[in-house]
């Protein structure tokens, strides 16, 4: 048992079941899955994070790439939907990861960009809370994967290939 397996087992049971169910459905509807995540920084260097209504913890905004979408189309759609954010810089592809959560076929493209928020994001059916945070003062319950990505982005940790 490795560290990644231990971390996955530490998730609440209902979260593990939901993730497995989604990947089971994707097994029959998609050959491989591809998603985007965005490390969105404001002009003060703060990172934008979201809390979902259906998963515990704080995450980088993002989601799946749908048929007919490019990575950048999906990225702009997700930051708009999850945070009322607009790109203030050209998104830079930081790394592409293999996400072993639920399957061995899910890839996540992580982009870094500077953003502006058109209006504060109000809670909805998907996002219960969101905001910009200083990297030195992150909220409680930031997911381990999100913390690892932030450490990689800042140069404090080596980049790994697994989400």
What are the residue ranges of the model-derived segments?
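Acidic, metal-coordinating catalytic segment for phosphate/diphosphate chemistry
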Residues: 2-37
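Nudix hydrolase/Nudix homology domain
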Residues: 5, 56-57, 125-163
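Short, well-ordered beta-strand micro-motif
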Residues: 40, 110-114, 134
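Conserved Nudix-box catalytic region and its N-terminal flanking loop in Nudix hydrolases
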Residues: 42-82
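Glycine-centered C-terminal helix-capping/turn motifs at helix ends
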Residues: 84-85, 132
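A short coil-to-beta-strand element that immediately follows conserved catalytic motifs
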Residues: 86-95
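Active-site-adjacent beta-strand/loop module that shapes the phosphate/pyrophosphate-binding cleft
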Residues: 96-120, 146
